[in-house]
Amino acid sequence: MLVLARRTNESIMIGDDIEIVIVDIKGDQVKIGVKAPRNVSVHRAEVYKDIQEENRKAAETKIKPEDLGKIGDILKKKDSGKKG
């Protein structure tokens, strides 16, 4: 792990297009800003772990393609029963 010291308003570059800026430092809390292209996902570590866990659970779901068709039929019947 690379460890760098930075002060408020100083930054770190990752590659050519990701910039990490130290926005504020108060006590033991550091606020950072991340400038990155829209196609780069940026998450806090605890949120990222939750996303990974949900993706893992979704990948393990054992839904068969024919079951998806049945769900579609049920939704169509439900929608056709609505009054507009």
Swiss-Prot record:
Homodimer; the beta-strands of each monomer intercalate to form a hydrophobic core, while the alpha-helices form wings that extend away from the core. Keywords: Bacterial flagellum biogenesis, Cytoplasm, Repressor, RNA-binding, Translation regulation. The keyword Glycosyltransferase does not apply. The keyword GTP-binding does not apply. The gene is csrA. Signal peptide: none annotated. Disulfide bonds: none annotated. Belongs to the CsrA/RsmA family. One of its GO terms (cellular component) is cytosol. One of its GO terms (biological process) is regulation of carbohydrate metabolic process. This is Translational regulator CsrA. InterPro entries: CsrA (IPR003751), CsrA_sf (IPR036107). Its main location: cytoplasm. SUPFAM superfamilies: CsrA-like. It comes from Leptospira borgpetersenii serovar Hardjo-bovis (strain JB197). It comes from the Bacteria. Pfam families: CsrA. One of its GO terms (molecular function) is mRNA 5'-UTR binding. A translational regulator that binds mRNA to regulate translation initiation and/or mRNA stability. Usually binds in the 5'-UTR at or near the Shine-Dalgarno sequence preventing ribosome-binding, thus repressing translation. Its main target seems to be the major flagellin gene, while its function is anatagonized by FliW. It is found in: Cytoplasm.
